[in-house]
Amino acid sequence: MSEKQTPVKELTLQEAQDEIKPLRAKLTKWGKEYYEQDNPTVEDHVYDRAYQRLVQLEEQFPQLVSADSPTQRVGGATESQLTKVRHEIPMLSMGDVFSIEELMDFNQRQQENRDVEVEPEYNLELKIDGLSLSLVYENGKLVQGSTRGNGTIGEDVTANVRTIKSVPAELPEPLSIEVRGECYMPKAAFAKLNAKREAEGLPVFANPRNAAAGSLRQLDPKVTAQRELDTFMYYVPEYQKIGVKTQAEALDRMRELGFNVNPNNRVVHNRDEIEKYIEEYTAQRDKLTYGIDGIVEKVNDLDTEVALGNTVKVPRWEIAYKFPPEEQATIVRDIVWTVGRTGNVTPTAVMDPVQLAGTTVSRASLHNPDYLREKDIRIGDTVYLHKAGDIIPEISKVDLTKRPADSVEYEIPTKCPVCGSELVHLDGEVALRCINPMCPAQIKEGLAHFASRNAMNIDGLGPRIIEQLWDKELIHDVAGLYRLNHDQLLTLDKFGEKSTANLLTSIDNSRNNSVERLLFGLGIRHVGAKAARIIMEHFGDLDSLMKADADEISAISGIGPTIGESIVTYFANQQVVKLIDELREVGVNFAYLGSRSNANPDSEWNGRRVVLTGKLTEMTRGEAKSWLENHGAKVTESVSKKTDIVIAGADAGSKLTKAQNLGIDVWNEQQFSQAMKEEQ
C-alpha cells in the first residue's frame, strides 16, 4: 500500500472503482494464504492497512459494495479433508483499531447508540495469537470440537481436540453448552517443534499461529498430540445457560467448569484505565510464554452485548486493539543471494545483530530486485527492522540521514551466485531467475521437494541428508535416489544400520506411489499437488500426459493454459525425457492409482465413505486404499456419522471404538477380501 494515496473523499466514483477491484483481489489472496493455507506472505499490519482502505472506500461509495468483498466475509473457505461442521451461532471475526483514539471513537459510537443504552464498563482481555476454536458439550461431555472456517462452516477437529490437555473431556456439571476460545502453541513448544523439524530436514513453521493451525487441523490425532497445543477459552454464546450477567463473570464461571482461561482480564471504566492496561501488556508481551497480537475490549454487560448485535461480519460489542509493530535500528553489512528450487534468486540483508521482539535478528529477506530498488537499500545503510506477525524480520525503512557520504546504489547481480549462468527476468515476473536446469542449488532444492510429504513422501530424506549425498557425489538427480545402496548410506554422518534401513525402505516404498505424487514431485512450474491429481485422474498414466498437447491439458476443468503450457514445455526438454526414462528403469510407478471418474458406477463401493484402521495381513493399507478408490470409494482418515464402513485389521484402536459407538458397519479383513473377490 502506498503512503501517498489520495484521500477517499477526494476520489471520483470511477477512481474508487478502479482502486477497489485490485485491492479486493489482493486481500482475497492474502486471506486465502492466512486462513486456508496457514502460510501468510505479508505481515498483519500490511493486511490491516489494506483492509481499512477498502472499508473506507466502501463506506464512501456504498454502491460499490459487493457480496464477495473481503469486508463481507469471515475467515476463509474450508477446503481441507476434514469433515465440515455447521456453526449454529456464526463465529464472527473482530473489527480492528490501531490507536487509542480509534478505540475511543468506537466506544463513543457505542454510547451514542440511539437504540441501546451502553454503560461505559468494559472487560479487557489479551488477544491470543492462535486460531479460533469451538467446543460443544452435551450433558457435560465433549461431543465436538471445530475451527471457525468461514464463520458458518468450520472443520471437525474433535479427535485432535481430545489430545489437548487443557480441554476437559467432561465438565463437573451436566451442561449442554458451546464454549469458544483460542487454540495456540506456547513459544517454548514452537521453538522445540521448529528445532526438531530443522534437524529432520523439514520446513519450519513461520510463526506459532501457523504451527497451531497446522497442528490442530492434522488428519492424524497422534501428530496433534505431539505438538503441545494449549487453549484459552473466553466466550459462551448462550451465557444464560451458565447463570452469568457479565463477561467477567463468564470467565470466572468457565474457570469453575475446568476450562483454561487467561488470568489477565480486567474490568475498566474510562480512558485512563484502558490506556494503562494497553501500556502494561505492550511492555510485557515479550515476557509472556504465549504470543499476543493485541488487546480485546468487550462490553461487560452481556444483555447489552446481545442488544448491540453484529454486522454481517463483526460484532458491535467488541473490538481488537492491534499492537503497532516494534522497530529496531541496525546497519546492513552485506546483501547475499540464494537460489531456490524453481531458479528464483532471492536477496537477503545481513545486518548487525539486534534484539527484536525477544529474539536476536541478523538477517532479513529483501524478496526481489524491485523491492530492493524501491526501498533503495544499500550496504552500510542504517535501517529499521520490525517483525512481520511478530515473527518474520523485515526492513520497514532506511534512515537516509545516516547514509554514508560514499554510499553507492546497490548493483543487482547478472549471474547466478551458484552456477554462474546468466540471470533473466521472465515475462510478468518480478523475480530474477537462473534458468540453468543443471544448477546445483536448484537440483538440491528439487531433491528436497521430490522427497517432501505431498510429493513422494520419502521419510527421513531432508536437506541435511541431501547435502551430504550431493557432496559425496552419490546422487545427481531424483532418479539417483533409487540407486542408493546400504554401503553408500552408511558413509553419511550420524547414519547407522537402523537409519540406513529406514531410509532405504522409505525410498523403496515411494516407487509404488500413485503417479500424481511423482508429477507434483518433479517440480514443474505452476503444478501444485491438487492440479497434479486432477491431471493424472484425467490421463491415467504419465506416458499419456507426455503425449498430450497444451490445448488438451488446458481443457481439463480447473487447469487452464498456464499449467498446460508449463507441462508441455517441461516435457519437451530432452534432459527431462532422459530423467523420466531413468525413473522408469528404476521401477517408479507411472500409473494413477486413485479413483477415476470412469470407475464402475455399478460397484457396491461407488460413492461409499470408508475408513481403514489397524494392521492388514493380506495386503498393505496403501494397496487396500488404492483398490477402494479404483472402485469409486472415498477413503477418509477419520470416522464420522457420514462414514459407511470401517475396515478393521489387527490392533485397531480408537477409530474402531468410535465406529462401534456410532453404529457404523465394521468389517474385518476376511470380509473385505471376500468382497474384493466378488467384485472381480
From Swiss-Prot:
This is DNA ligase. DNA ligase that catalyzes the formation of phosphodiester linkages between 5'-phosphoryl and 3'-hydroxyl groups in double-stranded DNA using NAD as a coenzyme and as the energy source for the reaction. It is essential for DNA replication and repair of damaged DNA. InterPro entries: BRCT_dom, BRCT_dom_sf, DisA/LigA_HHH, DNA_ligase, DNA_ligase_AS, DNA_ligase_CS, DNAligase_adenylation, DNAligase_N. Belongs to the NAD-dependent DNA ligase family. LigA subfamily. Residues 600-680 form the BRCT domain. Its EC number is 6.5.1.2. Zn(2+) binds at residues 416, 419, 434, 439.
